[in-house]
Regions:
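Electrostatic cytochrome c docking/interface patches
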Residues: 1-19, 33-34, 38, 63-65, ...
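Sequence/structural segment immediately N-terminal to covalent heme-attachment motifs in c-type
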Residues: 6-29, 43-46, 159-162, 167
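An acidic- and aromatic-residue-enriched active-site/binding cleft used to recognize and process polar
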Residues: 23, 28-31, 72, 103
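Electron-transfer interface patches adjacent to heme c in soluble/periplasmic c-type cytochromes
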Residues: 39-164
Length: 168
């Protein structure tokens, strides 16, 4: 699938936070080919979409919504919506039983691990260019700063290096 690209460094860090916090326990990332799912979440998932997921994040339970198409088309939510949702989920989704993650606003992204993660994924076949590790954190901070600026426009002041930024 030509539209499938390796994770950006910020997305890679966010994926690892997602795994660390056990988000996959309540959220799936695979839309099954059932009418009820495609009407709610969009086009069903294809096997090739997961070629760079290690470990895969399909999930097996849906306490929360499927996240495979989150951030696209009708499912797109603003950066400040996501920030507020991580801080206090029930304030953004009435009846949500998702726990709050206020510590994500305090903890810094582990940028010291970025190069090793990219190197490991390259060994597994992810097509990161040789030497990409040398400027990956610069790219990570550029993307993170863009999110930080979007949050600032919404009145939210937070440094670009916080873990919540990697999950938005």
């Amino acid at each position: 699938i030509s539209s499938v690209k390796p994770y950006t460094p910020l997305e890679l860090q966010g994926r690892d936070i997602y795994v660390r916090e056990g988000c996959y326990v309540c959220h799936s990332q695979m839309i099954r080919p059932f009418r009820s799912e495609t009407e709610r979440y969009g086009e069903y998932s294809k096997a090739g979409e997961f070629v760079y997921d290690r470990p895969f994040q399909w999930g097996s339970k849906r306490t929360g919504p499927d996240l495979a198409r989150e951030g696209t088309d009708k499912l797109k939510k603003s950066d400040d919506w996501h920030f507020r949702h991580f801080r206090e989920p029930s304030s953004m989704s009435e009846g949500s039983i998702m726990p709050a993650y206020p510590f994500l606003m305090e903890q810094k992204i582990d940028t010291a691990s970025t190069a090793a993660k990219i190197g490991a994924l390259r060994k597994l076949g992810t097509p990161y260019a040789v030497g990409y590790e040398q400027f990956a954190n610069s790219e990570l901070m550029t993307q993170a700063n863009s999110i930080r600026l979007n949050l600032k426009i919404s009145g939210i002041e937070i440094p670009a290096d916080r873990e919540v930024i990697a999950l938005i």
